[in-house]
Regions:
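An N-terminal assembly and electron-transfer interface module characteristic of large anaerobic redox
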Residues: 1-155
Length: 155
């Protein structure tokens, strides 16, 4: 969701400062904001668990670890490593059928989703992942056919 994407962007700033350096102010600010948002995420997770209707998301530190062995945290094109980590999180909680949607012809996201879905399928043979491009130039028939094929293969 939006919270995870915000945390992904903040973590990318922290990671960039750690790997490539940067101003002390940016380094401190990104770490402080990241810690604050993580604290708020933990409050949200507790509330979702207490309510009991929905599956609570994992803490973002868990999400960060999920893509290790797949992508470096420096990959920031499209949704970068976050898309891969989220697919792996879903598989680990028993969701094997995943539709990765790339809006507006996002080529970097398309490349990451396609490339990593193959590696994920190699490591998790029951994973049924389809990538769909949704933009004005996409054929609706092609999109529907890909979804039908995915559903036909679903467990």
């Amino acid at each position: 969701g939006m919270l995870e994407f915000t945390m992904y962007r903040l973590f990318s700033m922290v990671h960039e400062c750690r790997v490539h350096g940067g101003s002390l102010a940016r380094n401190i600010l990104s770490r402080v904001v990241m810690a604050y948002v993580q604290k708020k995420q933990r409050v949200l997770i507790r509330a979702i668990k207490k309510e009991g209707t929905f599956e609570a998301p994992h803490d973002f530190s868990h999400t960060i670890k999920m893509c290790e062995g797949y992508l470096d945290h420096g990959v920031k094109m499209g949704e970068g490593w976050l898309l891969t980590a989220e697919m792996l999180e879903l598989i680990h909680i028993g969701v094997n059928n995943i539709v990765a949607v790339q809006p507006f012809g996002c080529l970097p996201n398309h490349i990451v989703a396609k490339g990593m879905s193959r590696k994920i399928k190699d490591n998790f043979p029951n994973a049924n992942i389809v990538t769909l491009d949704y933009d004005p130039g996409s054929s609706i028939i092609n999109q529907e056919n890909r979804l039908r094929l995915m559903l036909a293969n679903a467990d």
